[in-house]
Amino acid sequence: MSEPVDPEAPLDEEPTDLDPTEAEPEEPGSSALRSFLGLFIVPLLVVLLCVAIFIGFGWIAYDRQSTRDYLGDLESGWKPRRVQAAYELSKILVSDPRALDKEPGAKAQVRRLFQEADDPEMRRYLALVLGRTGDREALPLLTAAANDEDDRTRIYALWAMGILGDARARDPLAKALSDEDSGIRKTAAFALGELRDPSAIPLLQPRLDDAVTDVRWNTALSLARLGSDAGVPVLETMVDRRLLAQVPDITPDQQEEAMLGAIRALAAVSGPAHKELFERLAKEDPNLKVRQAAMEAEKAVSSGR
């Protein structure tokens, strides 16, 4: 259907004086057109409005569903509902990691659906659900998914392995550190830090010289989480706005995130040596969150915490 003509479009020239009492002759077919508009277009618009209202209230109600409701929706025959349910469950588990413990058979159900799912988006969210439940039986499934044909599914699987926190994930994650895809390397570096296993330190250290900035940053942050100061030189670059500005395509939000993470990491592994840096950032940095993080780091260092 063609786009409607704008009834308020300006005329090309000023109108001449017309007698308002004189009606213009009706063009042939205009009556039929009005009938068509009245009988078809207007009712159609009403129907569309009702559908929009119905969908809107449906989503509001959906947002209030329980964990059990979402588990049921994972079995739905409608793909969008299944994917949305997996996404909602992954969010619930962030605030309540034991949410599925309250539902008998839920973990086994998620493992089964993860194995059966052939939709990449569904598998990605289910991977996060598996990781956030702390279900150790899910590790073999996530390890296999780390070799999936879909790169984004691989990233979610690696991420979930880190969230799971099972030390047995160390070797599969270490293998991913040498992948040709920088997104895979970055996620593997992050996930190894989440394992809190110091034996991962020597596996991570070579990635401090990675050609990709994101990989170096995540490696340095993970090393700090593991108690190693090997990444301090990289962390120092992450709080230098002059160097951050040279990173291609970096956004202000990403700069802020990098600085906040680096400040906390430096405070944890090299605190006293960077006291002056924290003081300077607390006074001079233009970002409020960065100043606040630097003040907290300086206070922690001064108190010996």
Model-derived features: positions:
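Extracytoplasmic/periplasmic/luminal assembly and interaction segments
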Residues: 75-79, 84-135, 182, 190, ...
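Hydrophobic membrane-insertion alpha-helices, especially the h-region
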Residues: 38-58
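Short inter-helical turns and helix N-cap capping residues of alpha-solenoid HEAT/ARM repeat scaffolds
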Residues: 77-78, 118-119, 149-150, 180-181, ...
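N-terminal intrinsically disordered, acidic low-complexity segments at the extreme N-terminus
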Residues: 1-29
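Structural signature of alpha-helical solenoid repeat scaffolds
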Residues: 90-91, 131, 162, 193, ...
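Conserved hydrophobic register position within alpha-solenoid helical repeats
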Residues: 85, 126, 157, 188, ...
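Amphipathic alpha-helical scaffolding segments comprising HEAT/armadillo-like alpha-solenoid repeats
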Residues: 61-73, 95-115, 135-147, 166-178, ...
